[in-house]
């Protein structure tokens, strides 16, 4: 008995039968996802609160609404995205039809994380279904309440001949990766991303890896400290800091640090009250393993704000660390929690040099009243995404691709980028079976005159020819 193998064979048979290709079928699956979100909103909010202590506001803004927006966008543009894309032609192909056809890969695997267990599961799923693929979904076993809904409720809204949910932990995921897929989409840590990529390489399966890293946040001396504090605190402590694009550390001068600390303290009190543990707006650490890891990081540098913790509640207070050394553990790993180290630099040049000697981050932030400073940080660094004078607001635009570079990942998605990620872009040229005299230039015996004429025909419209 091989239940998993049987499931994968069933899905492949459905794909090869052409079931997922029609626009009507794809639209029906997307509509089902939309109904799932609408009809189970409270159930999803409750599950997110149980798993991560997410407030209704955070759940709606960062999970349900974003997922619903992707569904709506895909439904509105599906037929336009599916259309063949006409391309320029050279003189030799003026009478032919040249286009790019967007084809589904086939059977795709989506492995989702626990920190945004709805958003980071459904947003890639929208792209995979819109592109006409059959999908195996592997939600995180760590966010167990959301996992239960995705396994038991979601399949009621989509065609189960083309969709399956696989449950389990690392062992089951490893078994899943032994099978051949046509595309793998993974969101998680760089360590596990390497395991996924190694497994995919055995079958030459293409992958998207949405990983993480240490996202820098540079703060210029000319900034208003309260404005910076408001924006940095909001996106550092959102979801208790368990966000892959959250700022992982602040780079600023000692003078700015002195102005920024009281502003951050004021903001944290305004956001979460005198007792943040009792605030309904502050999440909790997902499990004891992550809690213990984060509590150990509180010993790095010096605690300037916060630092309290409660193991029984998996609570870590919004914390700011100062006097942090570059080689301390808090600066050697992605924090993924409500802890914000401040690292002092003496100049913009030093900040840029500090950023560039580390792995390329998933996101990079620069605060300055000078647009030239922001543009200089943008120009002289590299990251998956960039935002000037705010936090992860670039994530709210489906018109911008989301993805990493280097150690923070490969590939991109959101909006049409998701559709393109899950589509094979097939180069197509349809020629006439007649008019053979027009092809005589390319046949032997060749001559200098024929060569000149052929090159002219091939180079028209700026095209070139590559023969492998």
Curated annotation (Swiss-Prot):
Q: Which residues carry this modification: Cysteine methyl ester?
A: 465
Q: Which residues are reported to carry the modification N-acetylmethionine?
A: 1
- Propeptide stretch(es), residue numbers: 466-468
Keywords from the UniProt entry? Acetylation, Cell membrane, Lipid metabolism, Lipoprotein, Membrane, Methylation, NAD, Oxidoreductase, Palmitate, Prenylation
- Lipid modification (S-palmitoyl cysteine) maps to 463
EC number(s) from the headed UniProt entry: 1.2.1.28, 1.2.1.5, 1.2.1.7, 1.2.1.48
Record keyword DNA-binding present:
no
CDD domains, per the entry? ALDH_F3AB
Respond yes or no to whether keyword Nucleotide-binding is given for this record. Answer: no
Q: How is it modified after translation?
A: Dually lipidated in the C-terminus; prenylation occurs prior to, and is a prerequisite for palmitoylation. It is also required for activity towards long-chain substrates.
State any GO CC term. Answer: extracellular exosome
Q: Which reaction does it catalyse?
A: an aldehyde + NADP(+) + H2O = a carboxylate + NADPH + 2 H(+); an aldehyde + NAD(+) + H2O = a carboxylate + NADH + 2 H(+); a long-chain fatty aldehyde + NAD(+) + H2O = a long-chain fatty acid + NADH + 2 H(+); a medium-chain fatty aldehyde + NAD(+) + H2O = a medium-chain fatty acid + NADH + 2 H(+)
Q: What is this protein called?
A: Aldehyde dehydrogenase family 3 member B1
User: Can you name the source organism?
Assistant: Homo sapiens (Human)
